[in-house]
Amino acid sequence: MTVRIRRYSDNDLGAIACNARAYPRMRLYVAEFQGGVRGFILWTEKSGFRQDVVLELEQVAVAAAYRKRGIGEALVVQSLPDVAKELAARSAALRAVIVSTRADNDAQRLYRKTLGAEIEAKVQSLYSADEVLMVARNPLGARQR
């Protein structure tokens, strides 16, 4: 038996779309502002088939010309309840959110403010600098404090 492993192509979408729709592990949201898409956020589910779900805030980005206007905060605050609602629809519950970032990245303030995330680990020289792992154990309640 020979199994060929290759990179995914757009032609493969039909073969995997059913699985992706039945169990979406990634959720991508965009921020529209002043007539265009100015940012996005990508949430990735890390829990396999467990009912207690850990999400990773995989990426949040805002176009440079539109930063410092609250778009990043809006992306987190407005998309996370929607993700939690989707989880609840399949009888799953959001347990925590994890996010990693450079130890000197100002985005840590955003993660503390919007998620209640705190640094739980620091990894020396992971990429080009030190990286921190932040965990939010009550992410939906962070803004209610």
Model-identified regions with their sequence ranges:
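Acetyl-CoA-dependent GNAT
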Residues: 3, 7-58, 63, 76, ...
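Conserved N-terminal entry element of GNAT/NAT acetyltransferase domains
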Residues: 1-11, 138-145
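Conserved acetyl-CoA-binding loop of GNAT-fold acetyltransferases
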Residues: 111-122
